[in-house]
């Protein structure tokens, strides 16, 4: 049965500066935490990515043609302040003015992220989210952007803070690649929320008339079985990745039950509790009461079972199905129940998880007035057909099926009261992936990376139909 979306519902594609722009050494751009990390790994490079730095007009024209009303983009902090602070690079400032003007020319509203995984190198070396200098410089950079880019009406402070903190210090898949440091993970989580709060409060004090929010990666966590120990493992995983952030950014306080779960994880790893001050908590509370929206990035769900051994993480970075391992000391082990479909990268396909997280925000965090689904999509191994022409349309029925199921779950949540106002597919075009390079394709538009030619995927045509009719077909 087809489902109806509200008439004011907006749809578009999502991008991130480091994953699409390329041009990492052009026009005075400074280095970021990934540059040295990827050089040493030697597996893949962030250039040319999708060459959005030079081809943004081509991609925005495609977005307009295929029914997009909105787009997610991020500002590369190190294009504006190559060193993270100090001297401004005017060529970087000029680029983003051109980008936003082109969005307007194509009748597409940009939702602009200030930090999308790309801390400037100097600040990363100073401690990244564990450094007070980083937090202060981030607020100063945000203030500059608010004053400079007055044409932007929708701002996002941080993209997926949980992905940064957990992958930097728990799983070790993001630089500095430390693992098992739950103390650093939770301190980074708190510090991110302090920086976010300071920026929200600053923006509101400037009375610029736009809106500001935050984007969270929220994967619903379920117990592997009905046993009490598996239920508790799911609660611990949820506290690590979801609950502390939801409490801080959407309720303005850390609930005692959440802090007890955090302390249990830290105690099991013989690590100290994170530090906070009354002044920081006051800022967090103030920000939660004036946040305009929350973005939900949801791709998959997790199932947890009790586990009492040492932490072990094996990241599936090449699409070898079944190669992932995730066991965390003091938390639990990820284990999929039988019958749950997965992608080649071991991400579960479970639309119910989208419904459950949207309803959780609606029911448990009533302060936040509006929700957007700011990322959702499926990574696939795709290739250009032989003898492709500019008119070639690449078939991707798996993507259409995936997005249809998740949009349907989202529509059910809207029907049941969740105030979801828009959906951004990850991703607009094929892009560079932080830990998978160029093998994992998410785009509505296929990018032939050697030539940078764009080709339409069938999903782009399907997406246009949904966007224009507001009807999700059977």
Swiss-Prot record:
Example GO molecular function:
6-phospho-beta-galactosidase activity
What reaction gets catalysed by this protein?
a 6-phospho-beta-D-galactoside + H2O = D-galactose 6-phosphate + an alcohol
User: This protein's superkingdom?
Assistant: Bacteria
> What keywords are assigned to this protein?
Glycosidase, Hydrolase
Enzyme class label = hydrolase
Q: Which residues form the active site?
A: 160 (proton donor), 375 (nucleophile)
* PROSITE patterns the UniProt entry points to: GLYCOSYL_HYDROL_F1_1, GLYCOSYL_HYDROL_F1_2
Pathway named in the protein's UniProt entry: Carbohydrate metabolism; lactose degradation; D-galactose 6-phosphate and beta-D-glucose from lactose 6-phosphate: step 1/1
Q: Which InterPro entries match?
A: 6P-beta-galactosidase, Glyco_hydro_1, Glyco_hydro_1_AS, Glyco_hydro_1_N_CS, Glycoside_hydrolase_SF
- List the EC numbers from the record: 3.2.1.85
UniProt binding sites for D-galactose 6-phosphate: 19, 116, 159-160, 297, 433-434, 440, 442
Q: What is one process in the GO biological process aspect for this record?
A: lactose catabolic process via tagatose-6-phosphate
The record's GO CC annotations read: cytosol
| NCBIfam families for this protein | lacG, PRK13511.1
The UniProt entry's sequence similarity note says: Belongs to the glycosyl hydrolase 1 family.
Protein name per UniProt: 6-phospho-beta-galactosidase
């Amino acid at each position: 049965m087809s489902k109806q979306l509200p008439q004011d519902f907006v749809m578009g594609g999502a991008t991130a500066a480091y994953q699409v722009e390329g041009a990492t050494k052009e026009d005075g751009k400074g280095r970021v935490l990934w540059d040295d990390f990827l050089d040493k790994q030697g597996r893949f490079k962030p250039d040319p990515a999708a060459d959005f730095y030079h081809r943004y007009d081509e991609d925005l024209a495609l977005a307009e043609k295929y029914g997009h009303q909105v787009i997610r983009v991020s500002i590369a902090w190190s294009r504006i302040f190559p060193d993270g602070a100090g001297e401004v690079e005017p060529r970087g400032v000029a680029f983003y003015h051109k980008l936003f003007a082109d969005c307007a020319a194509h009748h597409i509203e940009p939702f602009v992220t200030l930090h999308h995984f790309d801390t400037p190198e100097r600040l990363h070396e100073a401690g990244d989210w564990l450094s007070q200098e980083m937090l202060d410089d981030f607020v100063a950079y945000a203030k500059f952007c608010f004053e400079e880019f007055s044409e932007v009406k929708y701002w996002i402070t941080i993209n997926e803070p949980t992905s940064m903190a957990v992958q930097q210090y728990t799983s070790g898949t993001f630089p500095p690649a430390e693992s098992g440091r739950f103390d650093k993970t939770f301190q980074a989580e708190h510090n991110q929320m302090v920086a976010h709060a300071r920026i929200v409060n600053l923006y509101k004090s400037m009375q610029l008339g736009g809106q500001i929010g935050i984007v969270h990666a929220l994967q619903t966590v379920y117990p592997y079985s009905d046993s009490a120990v598996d239920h508790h493992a799911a609660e611990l995983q949820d506290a690590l990745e979801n609950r502390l952030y939801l409490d801080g950014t959407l309720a303005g306080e850390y609930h005692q039950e959440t802090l007890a779960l955090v302390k249990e994880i830290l105690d099991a790893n013989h690590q100290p509790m994170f530090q906070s001050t009354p002044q920081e908590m006051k800022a967090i509370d103030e920000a939660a009461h004036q946040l305009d929206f929350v973005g939900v990035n949801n791709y998959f769900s997790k199932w947890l079972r009790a586990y009492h051994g040492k932490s072990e993480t094996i990241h599936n970075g090449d699409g070898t199905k079944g190669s992932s391992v995730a066991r965390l000391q003091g938390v639990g082990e990820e284990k999929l129940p039988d019958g749950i479909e997965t992608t080649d990268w071991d991400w579960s396909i479970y639309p119910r998880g989208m419904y459950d997280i949207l309803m959780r925000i609606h029911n448990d965090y009533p302060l936040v007035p509006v929700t957007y689904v700011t990322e959702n999509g499926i990574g696939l191994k795709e290739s250009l057909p032989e003898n492709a022409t500019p008119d070639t349309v690449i078939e991707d029925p798996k993507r259409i099926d995936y997005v249809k199921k998740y949009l349907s779950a989202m529509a059910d949540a809207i029907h049941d009261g969740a105030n979801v106002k828009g959906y951004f597919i990850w991703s607009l075009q094929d892009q560079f992936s932080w830990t998978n390079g160029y093998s994992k394709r998410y785009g509505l538009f296929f990018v032939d990376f050697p030539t940078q030619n764009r080709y339409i995927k069938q999903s782009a045509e399907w997406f246009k139909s949904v966007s224009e009719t507001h009807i999700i077909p059977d």
